[in-house]
């Protein structure tokens, strides 16, 4: 029989061995933390996996083909929708700030006004129209001018906003720019649809479809008009918020604090310019700036109004970038009166008392007159915008 003392010694020895094993295990764990190593594979890799690992480990990246660090890939649409970036800019008229002076006027939204028009200018390139008549054999410069004259008549008939007219013309040009072989039977339907869409975009009560069909002489049915509406929407990408020269002109009139007669004269010049095919390729902001300067000159007693720092500040153009277009717009006023005498909608509209009879104000001498010609002088080469 084992004695109690012997049993006690055995128990103590067992406890000592247990403590020793525990300390050794703790030491091994501590050593593993200090010197970590990859655990051995439980089984040998297959031949295919071994070859794959060898290929991956030997793969090298060509730094010449790799994008620079920190450079993200952006699509064209992403670039078009980026806000305008501020560049080095020297204020040509630092002593005058129209928006600061209008800070107390809630109608002027002076905190945002300049930013809005900066964004408009940034977006102009997105709605750029390029030459398209070569793609439509049945449509020429005169046909387009007749169409725009008729659209002005429709705008007056329904008493639509001016923005609706300008937007409708822009939609028409954008559609023709992106399509081919539009015939004369389709182009009037296109104009009706453009007015219909622009009115739904800008008016409280757009014209009825049946009224548009009636004014077009019942040349197409209701279903045909609605089908054309869907086609125009798809062609322009459902993008209707085009910057308009009419809005730029109103902005220039405000910052220069001109009277309503001067602003109306500018509108008459701009609406006349809508009939000129080549002007569809000119930026809306430049057209507005040129029309504004020409209006100021026509109403100035000495016809000596010049480009000034205020206009440069708020239009973004220098005088050299605008004055050639001013001269050509004056030529167009003469040409439209002499050669397009049957296109009377714009001139009759601005002969009314409500528009200060501005259409009857004497024009400046035409320095670009083309003798015995049925076409106007070439439009000067202009950058965009």
Swiss-Prot record:
A Pfam family per the record: Cyclin_N
Biased segments, Basic and acidic residues type: 17-28, 63-80
Disordered: annotated span: 1-48, 63-88
Biased composition (Polar residues): 1-16
Molecular function GO terms recorded: cyclin-dependent protein serine/threonine kinase regulator activity
Deleted gene: phenotype: RNAi-mediated knockdown causes a longer meiosis II in 1-cell embryos without affecting meiotic exit timing. In a pam-1 (or282) mutant background, restores normal timing for meiotic exit.
Cell location: Nucleus
Any one biological process term the GO annotation gives: pronuclear migration
Keyword vocabulary terms for this entry: Cell cycle, Cell division, Cyclin, Meiosis, Mitosis, Nucleus
Cited InterPro entries: Cyclin, Cyclin-like_dom, Cyclin-like_sf, Cyclin_A/B-like, Cyclin_C-dom, Cyclin_N
GO CC terms in record: cyclin-dependent protein kinase holoenzyme complex; cytoplasm; nucleus
Function: Could be involved at the G2/M (mitosis) transition. Interacts with the CDK1 and CDK2 protein kinases. G2/M cyclins accumulate steadily during G2 and are abruptly destroyed at mitosis. Plays a role during oocyte meiosis II.
PANTHER family: CYCLINS
Record-stated family: Belongs to the cyclin family. Cyclin AB subfamily.
Protein name listed in UniProt: G2/mitotic-specific cyclin-B3
Source species: Caenorhabditis elegans
Phylogenetic placement of the source organism: Eukaryota, Metazoa, Ecdysozoa, Nematoda, Chromadorea
């Amino acid at each position: 029989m084992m004695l109690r003392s012997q049993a006690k010694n055995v128990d103590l020895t067992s406890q000592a061995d247990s403590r020793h094993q525990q300390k050794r295990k703790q030491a091994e764990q501590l050593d593993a933390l200090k010197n970590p190593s990859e655990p051995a594979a439980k089984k040998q890799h297959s031949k295919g996996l071994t070859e794959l690992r060898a290929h991956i480990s030997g793969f090298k990246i060509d730094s010449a083909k790799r994008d620079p660090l920190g450079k993200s890939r952006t699509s064209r649409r992403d670039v078009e929708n980026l806000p305008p970036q501020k560049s080095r800019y020297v204020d040509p008229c630092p002593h005058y700030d129209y928006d600061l002076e209008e800070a107390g006027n809630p109608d002027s939204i002076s905190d945002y006004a300049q930013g809005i028009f900066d964004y408009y200018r940034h977006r102009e390139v997105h709605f750029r129209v390029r030459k398209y008549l070569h793609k439509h054999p049945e449509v020429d410069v005169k046909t387009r001018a007749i169409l725009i004259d008729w659209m002005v008549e429709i705008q007056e008939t329904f008493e639509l906003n001016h923005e609706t007219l300008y937007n409708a013309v822009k939609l028409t040009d954008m559609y023709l720019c992106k399509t081919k072989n539009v015939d004369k039977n389709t182009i009037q339907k296109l104009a009706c649809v453009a007015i219909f869409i622009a009115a739904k975009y800008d008016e409280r009560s757009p014209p009825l479809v049946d009224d548009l069909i009636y004014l077009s002489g019942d040349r197409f049915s209701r279903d045909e008009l609605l089908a054309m509406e869907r086609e125009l929407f798809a062609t322009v990408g459902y993008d209707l918020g085009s910057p308009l020269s009419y809005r730029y002109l109103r902005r220039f009139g405000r910052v220069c604090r001109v009277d309503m007669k001067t602003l109306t004269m500018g509108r008459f010049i701009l609406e006349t310019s809508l009939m000129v095919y080549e002007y569809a390729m000119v930026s809306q902001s430049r057209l507005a700036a040129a029309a504004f300067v020409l209006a100021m000159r026509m109403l100035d007693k000495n016809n000596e109004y010049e480009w000034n720092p205020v206009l440069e500040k708020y239009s973004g153009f220098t005088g050299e970038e605008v004055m050639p277009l001013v001269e050509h717009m004056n030529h167009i006023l003469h040409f439209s009166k002499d050669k397009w005498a049957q296109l009377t909608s714009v001139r009759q509209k601005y002969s009314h008392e409500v528009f200060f009879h501005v259409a009857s104000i004497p024009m400046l001498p035409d320095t670009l007159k083309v003798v015995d010609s049925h076409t106007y002088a070439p439009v000067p080469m202009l950058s965009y915008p």
